[in-house]
Amino acid sequence: YQLYAKHHAEFTADEIYILSKELDTVIYFDALSEVSVRVSHDLFVSKKRINFDVDSVDKVIESFMSKDYIRIREIDSFLAFPSVGYEWNEYMLESFLISYSKKFVLLNNGQSLHNVAGAIVKKDGKIKEFEDACAAVLSESRIELKKSEALNYLADVNMITRRSYKDLD
């Protein structure tokens, strides 16, 4: 996947999906993230084509943080984010957090071609593990803490990308 991304300045999510079928493998998002930025649901671009003002973006993210974490989908307005030549959205935010942020990290159970999920936490904060972020989200919910209800809730609030997660007990 990294080799594909290195040889394509731009490529689409559909092209990656087709590649995964041709290779008969899952999509290795970590390899893609090494050399590309997902700038929208449909488009990935080379890291060489985008320049983030990391401190400014981190400052905007910090303005959304009122506790130890926020769900990535809680950032639903991108007007305050600095211009980077592409319109800001949750996919670009996910890429920024994975590859660029100095202050924040995205905790999730993996990336998805169709969804952005997880929690944004401070790198020097109390929450270090994805399971701890899920526990914090569930502790603030009013659901009965049974595994199926917890999984449904975490999927509904975009903490997990699918309604299964083996490490949730």
Report residues per predicted region:
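C-terminal non-catalytic scaffold/interaction domains in large multidomain proteins
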Residues: 1-169
